[in-house]
Amino acid sequence: MAKRRLNKRQQWRIEKIQKERTVRAARKEKAVEEQAAAGELGPEQNGLVIAHYGQQLDIEALEGPESGQVFRCFVRANIDSLVTGDRVVWRPGKSKTGVIVARCERENLLQRPDNFGALKPVAANIDHIILVIAPEPEPHDNLIDRYLVASESSDIPAVILLNKTDLINDDNRDQIEALLARYQALGYEVARTSAAETAGTPAPEVEALVRNQTSVFVGQSGVGKSSIIQTLLPDELLRVGAVSESTGKGVHTTTTAKLFHLPGGGDLIDSPGIREFGLWHMTPQEVEYGFREIRPLIGLCKFRNCRHMGDPGCALDAAAEAGDISPERLKSFHRILQDMTDQQARGLKLT
């Protein structure tokens, strides 16, 4: 469906609203700066980034009499990019505002390249990635493998969660079972659920995954990430979209990465849907490392410059012939490498 064109009045109104928001934000930031200059800010303390709105972030106080309260904070210009899940040092101001003065060291960082090749952080300090797939939209090995390569390169464990099990039928059952079996054979944890069948209550299998963990849900649009989160956090207002009947693709429903505290313990980060998880910022060697069954074969090819594309003496081809690498995973590996080559041919470089 083509995008609806806006008339001049609509464009003017949108620009006016954006300008007003910018002015309000600048006014608040100036007020906080004046408080800092006057010595009116509170003492430095630890906080947690629970939401990100451009230059403003929601920080939850982690200590002191205001522990658990949320403050809208501004970021000092000398601080690198912050993401949901970051732990920071901040100073409270008036009217639930504050200033972030430092970012604490990260345990890990999940990031991906944007359409221009620049790395964009997604979430920090997470215990595992929950990769949600579903019978509809149809799951594809290549997209799943992109997420798994990203998790392996970040040293963040990944769990594959099959949602919408109520949509499994005789037409797709064998394909889905074969797909899940491939990843279980590689040692990946696989869980199953159906948010539509839990009547709004959290499924025990999902609660077990997220309990006392900091989790981030990823997956293509339409697989039901927001629906699952809504069962875990029924009091939170999350917009839930349906799969488009015309395209079969999902509709993005989450626009801002947010961190939620779970009633049963643990935290959950819900980030905007990601349709394509590009890996062109990686080297071929890093992609090799991201495939668990290929990792032990690194450096075993006959020639050091082996491209793993049918070259003589390729250790990957030998492993595939021996059944140690599935045809689907090898095809996915080749496609990722080809995508990287295509991006380089287009002149895409990291900034």
From Swiss-Prot:
Its cofactor is Zn(2+). GO terms for molecular function: GTP binding; GTPase activity; metal ion binding; rRNA binding. GO terms for biological process: ribosomal small subunit biogenesis. It is found in: Cytoplasm. CDD domains: YjeQ_EngC. Monomer. Associates with 30S ribosomal subunit, binds 16S rRNA. This is Small ribosomal subunit biogenesis GTPase RsgA. It comes from Marinobacter nauticus (strain ATCC 700491 / DSM 11845 / VT8) (Marinobacter aquaeolei). The gene is rsgA.
